[in-house]
Amino acid sequence: MSDPATKPFLAHRDLWLLALCQGLFLTNNVVFIAINGLVGLSLAPAAWMATLPVTGYVVGGALAAGPVARLQARLGRRRCFQIGLLVAIASAAVCAFAAAQQNFWLLVGATLVAGFYNANAALYRFAGPELVPPQYKERAISWVLAGGVIGAVAGPNLASATRDWFVVPFAGAYLCLVGVALLSLLAMSLIRFPAPPAPKTGASTGRPLSEIARQPVFIVAVLCAALGYGVMNLLMAATPIAMQMCSHPFDRAALVLEWHVLGMFVPSFFTGHLIRRFGVLPVAGVGVVLNLACIAVALSGVDLMQFLVALFLLGVGWNFLYIAGTTLLTEAYRPEEKNRAQGAMDFCVFATMALTSFGSGALVTTQGWTWLNLGSLLPMAAVAAGLAWLATQRKTQVA
């Protein structure tokens, strides 16, 4: 058997399978984003509640982030990931039933439960580096996230193609997600994750989370990932509703989301290389600039191309910030601290997404698309300030 340390990067079969699982996870997420707000708008007691099914998925992820981290420490990566996929199968079936029954609150409850899958799959990016030698760490994170290209193509097209399968719009899309999760469950069963190290008697369990979280690198990592994801989610979740309010048909909204998700994940094929060559902070800085460019384009008008270009730039900006944040986080913890540090970051990400997914529906239906974009400037300013602070800290340490 060949030594894994000497194998070429692309020869690691398990990494490819994990990237496939990531792609199927993003297929699920893109379908949820594309249809949950519209289904919610048709069922909700009030228009401002339209994105509650999207919010439920994110809140479920936030609530599950801590338990999932502990479950992974106890059961290992694969078994915990498989449990998450079983939850995905069950919750997608309940979503289809809720849509058929025109039951808004059952739909919200089903997406809340589906958040357990969301929290599990969010850890795929951390599991990737464990499947390859240390010198491939940044590339492994990027390539796992690059699997999302599958979701970029499959998700919008699946949502559009299955919209009218049944009398109830989009019930067929939810049922298709059952099959997507089953395929992911099969791929997950073939991945050989390294066994977690056996606990040693008297061995250190690492620093408390409060100490880990006080590090500048941890703070900025969370700022990049959480606020980058928050702004992306704020604008993405509102896009189908905003386009419908601007009289664009659903197939155009699906096209915009397809290009948005391509922007999110196609750069993953080279983001890791950019980080190794130019450094993590410059790449994150470019992510901030791309987000600002997105806002500028979005504010310039509401034609199809303006939505498409803005959401594409938003996707690329998210990619740079998210991968940079994830890479920074790996500098903030020791091996025995990984579950609590990763769980803390993902809790912050999900909590931010919960606020923005709910806020997107309320803001776009009451204040409009323009104010939604203007509100995105403040989080980006906070990320830029954090990056400048960490860069100053590192220059001081070198001096």
Residue ranges of predicted features:
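Juxtamembrane intracellular "pre-TM" segments in multi-pass secondary transporters
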Residues: 1-12, 193-222
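Hydrophobic core of transmembrane alpha-helices in multi-pass small-molecule transporters
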Residues: 23, 104-119, 306-320
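Intracellular juxtamembrane helix-capping segments at the cytosolic ends
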Residues: 36, 118-132, 320-333
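Helix-to-loop junctions at the C-terminal end of transmembrane segments
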Residues: 64-77, 266-280, 364
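C-terminal ends and interior cores of transmembrane alpha-helices
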Residues: 86-101, 290-302
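Cytoplasmic helix-loop-helix junction between adjacent transmembrane helices
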Residues: 110-147
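Glycine-rich segments within core transmembrane alpha-helices of 12-TM secondary carriers
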Residues: 139-157, 348-356
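C-terminal membrane-cytosol helix-exit motif in multi-pass small-molecule transporters
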Residues: 160, 178-199, 386-391
